[in-house]
Regions:
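Loop-rich non-cytosolic ectodomains and luminal regions
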Residues: 1-167
Length: 167
C-alpha cells in the first residue's frame, strides 16, 4: 500500500474458524509508521506509534479479542520499520487497519498475512495484489528465484511467490 495525505485503509476479512494469526507491516526508512486497528464492532485501538522497539497490548472487550502489537526497526542504522500485530481469538468479520506515517521519503508499505496452512482460508485481505509476494529466501539480494507453473491452467500457480523484492 501507500500512505496518501491522510492514511491508508487496509481491510482484512477474518473467518469464523480463525483462532489467531500474525500480520506484519514493513515500511521504508526513514519513515515512522503508525497503525490504528478497528474491530468489526467499531472499537478502535487509537494510534499505535512505531519506533526502535516496544510493545502494546490491547483487548477488544466486545469481541473478546486480544491484540499484541510489537514494533521495531530491523536495522537501527538505516533499516526497515516493522510493526507486528498478533491477533488472539479474533472476532470474525471485517477488521480495518489504518496506516499513517511521518510523510518522509517513499511512503509505501507492505502488509503480510501468514502463508497457506498457517491461517484459515476464510481470512484474507479484501483487496490484495499477488505481485509483491516474494518470501524468504527469494527476497535477498543477488539471488534469482523462480515461481511454480501450473500446467493444467497454463499460468503461474496461484500460490507461487512472485514479484519484485522490497529493495
Amino acid at each position: 500500500g501507500q500512505v496518501s495525505q491522510n492514511d491508508a485503509k487496509v481491510e482484512v476479512k477474518v473467518g469464523e474458524s480463525e483462532y489467531g494469526f500474525t500480520m506484519e507491516l514493513w515500511g521504508l526508512a526513514p519513515n515512522r509508521y503508525y497503525v490504528d486497528i478497528e474491530s468489526p464492532s467499531g472499537q478502535k485501538t487509537g494510534r499505535i506509534q512505531g519506533g526502535l522497539s516496544g510493545q502494546r497490548y490491547v483487548t477488544f472487550l466486545l469481541e473478546k479479542t486480544r491484540l499484541i502489537v510489537e514494533y521495531f526497526t530491523v536495522d537501527t542504522s538505516a533499516g526497515a520499520p516493522v510493526i507486528v500485530m498478533r491477533f488472539q481469538n479474533p472476532a470474525p468479520g471485517i477488521w480495518n487497519i489504518y496506516v499513517r506515517d511521518d510523510g518522509v521519503g517513499n511512503r509505501e508499505f507492505d502488509l503480510w498475512l501468514p502463508i497457506t496452512n498457517f491461517i484459515s482460508e476464510d481470512t484474507f485481505f479484501l483487496e490484495s495484489t499477488p505481485y509483491n509476494t516474494l518470501v524468504a529466501p527469494s527476497n535477498t539480494g543477488l539471488l534469482i528465484s523462480c515461481g511454480s507453473y501450473n500446467s493444467n491452467t497454463g499460468s503461474l500457480a496461484i500460490d507461487s511467490s512472485r514479484g519484485f523484492p522490497r529493495n
